[in-house]
Amino acid sequence: QTAFITNNNISITGASPKHSFYLGVGYSYEQGNIEHEKFSKVTINASNDYKITDYLKVGFQFNGARMLPADSKQVLNALRATPIAPVYNDEYGLYSALPEFQKAQINNPMVDVSLRANTTKAENYRASGNIYGEVDFLKHFNFKAMFSMDYASNNGRTYQPIVKVYDPTVSGNIATLGTGKTEVSQFKENETKVQSDYVLTYTNSFDNGNHNLTATAGFTTYYNSLSRLDGARKQGVGLVIPNDPDKWFVSIGDAATATNGSTQWERSTLSMLARVIYNYKGKYLFNGSFRRDGSSAFSYTGNEWQNFFSLGGGWLMSEEEFMKDIKWLDMLKIKASYGTLGNQNLDKAYPAEPLLSNAYSAVFGKPSIIYPGYQLAYLP
């Protein structure tokens, strides 16, 4: 469809030699090129910086949003569906199932677009911001402390209706997709990120500006946690769950069909860092850095602390006298660097401590007793 999009923003800003502020509110709405995939968002942004004295400055920033995400469907299946299959059967007034060689993997995308339209209600909330203080002292020193936080809360409910399609390969030419039962599911997810940074910087020039030095030392902490709960229930015998958002709650379904799941983890890092940047006459460049990181994700291995460093150098040749007459070349720099890196952001929250998952069971004894089997979900 031809979609309607609107973006609306209003803001207030002001500044003086010692104070600046900003406040903005926005609203966005997208109808979506695919029917029933509308999206809307309300945002608020605020910031304030205040220069208390010539050497002391404080401020904050806040961003908030409420989003109603699109009721997304598997429309990309249209790219994979065979082009010879009819989309709709006029005689039966039903959408068609795809041919036998495809229908086990792919549904007719129009079934999702039309028959499963508006079957998801979700709300996403997010708030993030920071406060900071910055002080200059002893002419060449600067110290900045910042505390940041990011909080997200997402929840949603989904309804699965009974969907019938035209399928000439079954008796009566009408097939029911899935289990043939209405179903509701719910989820709720919260994630928190907290970070603090403390950075001391020394900047100075010597010998009439020929030697320029910037040295930085810092200490940072980071905390991240996530908690998610999922649940679903199907209808009871003869008790169809109505297609009414006010009734899309798992408490309405048959308790005997309940399924649930959860995900939760938390971890933190602590880092100490130092960096030196030096140049001579702006042409000969050097930098070196060192950091020591500790991560709770590896605490069970006794190897949670690691050291990382980097060294780099450069030569800005275009600033040399013998390059001044080359007009067609604006800048020429030769540089090289070497360093070590680490990564804790793997697809597992605890890469060093794998969880157990179900495996093949075994039967022993008379009478027979089933012994459930377990295995490591992944190798550490």
Please name every model-derived segment.
Residues 1, 5-7, 76-112:
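Acidic, glycine-rich flexible loop segments
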Residues 16, 95, 341-344:
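Gly/Ser/Thr-rich beta-alpha loop segments that engage phosphate groups in nucleotides
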Residues 41, 47-56, 61-66, 76, ...:
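Extracellular/periplasmic, surface-exposed regions of secreted and cell-surface proteins
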Residues 167-168:
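Intrinsically disordered, compositionally biased low-complexity regions
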